Amino acid sequence: MARKKGGSGAKNGRDSNPKYLGVKVYGGTEVSAGSILVRQRGTSIHPGNNVGCGKDYTLFAKADGVVTYHERKGRKLASIEAK
């Protein structure tokens, strides 16, 4: 029998890197095409007019304009009102 306990005594002390999720541009703000509007896990906010959705569900502007957030059929949408 070993006199001392094997290595790995500490079970805590780990933490994941921050993911910086959330709304990056709020309603009423003017944006240019390609601007990131929302970073999210899954589609809690869906893309509306002139808004695209990346493979990691990031919403981005497809055209220059003003950002609006609204609800349709119980679903939150982000849209761009083009200039």
Curated annotation (Swiss-Prot):
Query: What's an example GO cellular component term for this entry?
Result: cytosolic large ribosomal subunit
Instruction: Say yes or no: keyword Ribosomal protein present.
Output: yes
Q: List the disulfide bonds.
A: none
Output the SUPFAM superfamilies linked to this UniProt entry.
Ribosomal L27 protein-like
What is one process in the GO biological process aspect for this record? translation
Q: Which Gene3D superfamilies match?
A: 2.40.50.100
Molecular function as annotated in GO: structural constituent of ribosome
Enumerate the UniProt keywords alphabetically.
Answer: Ribonucleoprotein, Ribosomal protein
Q: Name one Pfam family in it.
A: Ribosomal_L27
Q: Which domain of life is it from?
A: Bacteria
Task: Give the protein family.
Answer: Belongs to the bacterial ribosomal protein bL27 family.
Instruction: Tell me the protein's name.
Output: Large ribosomal subunit protein bL27
